Amino acid sequence: GDVYKRQICIGVGNEGEGRTHYSGQLISGNVLDAELAIGDYEPQISIQIWKRAMDNARIELIAPTGERLVISDRNAGVVHHNIKNMRIVSKAYGPGPFYMGEEIYAAMVATSGYITSGIWEIRFTVENVLDGFFNMWLPPVSTLSSATGFLRPSPEYTFTIPGTSRRAICVGANGRAPGSAATFSGRGVNVKSGLMLYAKPDITAVSYTHLTLPTTY
């Protein structure tokens, strides 16, 4: 905007009430369990976990049937598991020269039928941490069963790429009541939290009961 006198505006997406994001803080020596409900008829699902690379924790998936599967450990590398009619593959990425975070990506794929439905647990057995903040995301709500999602979701950090760009104007949606936000509207944060240090969205716009121009004249 300073150079070309132009500005890019990007919508925040519709993940605000989708139960697709979980945010928490790890504490040295503690165990943290995040519960994930998986509904019927899910052929596959992925989980992205973002944390500080210097925060050390063993991460397990615990199936509704009780199987415990390590998806990330200090020396795990690429991890493969096969249980019943499912294949689970996970890998850690990062850190890099310009980013000290780490991503753990886990893919759960049914080899026949569907993923085992029920309450899964993602367990963090924590060794030592610097600040402990972490975030987890599921795929977009539009691709999931309505029964699938975290049991204790966080509406923060639900704005979507490319709205995460620092220099673009990120636009959220107003709610029906004056001064409120639409529940479906993706959200950023307004305080220092985890790996992000800037607030989003930048502005909001009308989302209910407004008139639009016709497509033909």
Region spans (language model):
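Extracellular S/T/G-rich loop segment that most often corresponds to the catalytic His/Ser-adjacent loop
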Residues: 7, 18-107, 112-116, 124-125, ...
